[in-house]
Amino acid sequence: MRLDVEQTSKLDRVRADYNVHYWSQGFYGIDDQGEMYVSPRSDNAHQIQLSKIVKQLEERQLNVPVLVRFPQILHQRVHSICDAFNQAIEEYQYPNKYLLVYPIKVNQQREVVDEILASQAQLETKQLGLEAGSKPELLAVLAMAQHASSVIVCNGYKDREYIRLALIGEKLGHKVFIVLEKMSELDLVLREAKSLGVTPRLGIRIRLASQGAGKWQASGGEKSKFGLSASQVLNVISRLKKENQLDTLQLVHFHLGSQMANIRDVRNGVNESARFYCELRTLGANITYFDVGGGLAIDYDGTRSQSSNSMNYGLVEYARNIVNTVGDVCKDYKQPMPVIISESGRSLTAHHAVLISNVIGTETYKPETVTEPEEDFPLLLNNMWRSWLNLHNGTDARALIEIYNDTQSDLAEVHSQFATGVLTLEHRAWAEQTSLRIYYELNRLMSTKNRFHRPILDELSERLADKFFVNFSLFQSLPDSWGIDQVFPVLPLSGLQNAADRRAVMLDITCDSDGAIDAYVDGQGIESTLPVPAWNEDEPYLMGFFLVGAYQEILGDMHNLFGDTHSVVVNVGDQGEINIDFINEGDTVEDMMRYVHIDVDQIRKNYHSLVSQRVDQEEQQQILAELEQGLSGYTYLEDF
């Protein structure tokens, strides 16, 4: 019984260290066996260990890395966002409705878009629409929007073809809002609408003075790429009046930027845009839709803060701030309250997907015995030896800092003297091994309670951390981690009761030094290393990369010709059964070669030619078979 209590207490500390409760929104957790689980059902029934899903996939000959999608989580996110706005509307007694418009750029995968639309299939009144930002996306949503509310919002730069396609959408029975991003688009829309005999539905994107903070702050503000200034907005009104087309302007749109961490920035932007809406109404524009764009954030690190990886508000608070602000401004102006639209793609999709892969090897520092330098070793190395003796024989906290600084200085000098030929390779090897042992002991003896020790401990933690080589490409599967330093929760899937054993950093298998994760969720902050159970080469060691359902797979690139991973759709049944409903196999080597226009048929001919010329006849078939197997195989590592 006592062991059970101790185990539970230990796991509670581990759960706190990984901050799982806060970033997971209840969809993921650590069970009492130290296993990561998923709980995707709306009734919260059944906690399914992720490692069991991997075992079922292996039985189907599907190896990691694999992206696992949970459509039940997508359904829950749709309902949660809509419910938050519906609650805010009811509380405020707001006399209009809310629409959740999904911008498919966030994740255009068919399995994702179909499930989002299916989430409201049984509802008589649907609160879903779709957004397109390009011609290809528009052509996709024109065939899908009838499964939602038939509302389509068209953003992005537009040419004649784009505009004609949007207008054709009206003929297909959709409500297509063509959002003007620049003045020249207005002439195109009016001309093509007349040509097709269609009354257009126009929207106008406002370039606000308000600007958020964070990685995407350039999306808002007066220098933003998109949107019309106040004077340009008035020019649009004047032109529409002149053409007797003012009633075609039906929507006001703004976008402060993705991942808005501070609710005050959201409120300020909504307030400014709501005043644009009311001013345009007073000028005679019959605008009835108010589109707040994206920005609803994800709490990637679980700190509920204003950091760019977090958010200092919840769903209900977000909805209340928008509804209340729009309502209050409309009351001030005595204008009708519009339909509210949000384009909350990141919040909708991020939680539903997990990338799972395996650790294929590690590099671990193991303390070695420090040997006394030989008599002919230089004075510099003897200085390092004295530092080790002082540390080994015991010293006070202040001296620990001095030993650290001396060792840093001595090691730098060793590298300098080796580069100029003063020291030998043997000298350098001794110095590096001795310094590592000194660092190891300093890390053990220093305390986080001493504020002067803390920055040194951070440095030592990085220096001594295990290197975990994980079978994935950061550039393909987590491009935002590399490109904009986005933090994603990363956890081992098993053995978490021993998570404090080691600290590690995750490295991918690309031939690029940037292929490393530099920041990890750890308690109430971000650390440069991750607490992990020790690696055992005799047992599979699985890592999970969470909250990767938004943007990552569509932004991923083909560095080193690593392609898309396998992806699967998993639903959890009423009895807790794991239903693998769809498997999309990842790219083969041949797929990737063809993508970069390598003639694979010629490759095969070259193989045959080389084999026939260079390989003994009895080996030729075997060699050709292995080469062919390589072409048809997964781009990731499989054979261990």
UniProtKB/Swiss-Prot annotation:
Any one GO biological process: spermidine biosynthetic process
Where does the chain bind substrate?
Answer: 290-300
The record's comment on protein family reads: Belongs to the Orn/Lys/Arg decarboxylase class-II family. SpeA subfamily.
The yes or no answer to whether the keyword Transcription regulation is present is no
Principal EC category: lyase
Q: Does the keyword Membrane apply?
A: no
Q: Which reaction does it catalyse?
A: L-arginine + H(+) = agmatine + CO2
Protein known as? Biosynthetic arginine decarboxylase
Q: Which PANTHER family match?
A: ARGININE DECARBOXYLASE, BIOSYNTHETIC ARGININE DECARBOXYLASE
Residues modified as N6-(pyridoxal phosphate)lysine are: 105
Task: Explain the purpose of this protein.
Answer: Catalyzes the biosynthesis of agmatine from arginine.
Q: Which cofactor does it need?
A: Mg(2+); pyridoxal 5'-phosphate
Which GO-annotated molecular functions does the record name?
arginine decarboxylase activity; metal ion binding
Sorted alphabetically, the keyword list is: Decarboxylase, Lyase, Magnesium, Metal-binding, Polyamine biosynthesis, Pyridoxal phosphate, Spermidine biosynthesis
Q: What is the lineage of its organism?
A: Bacteria, Pseudomonadati, Pseudomonadota, Gammaproteobacteria, Vibrionales
Q: What is its EC number?
A: 4.1.1.19
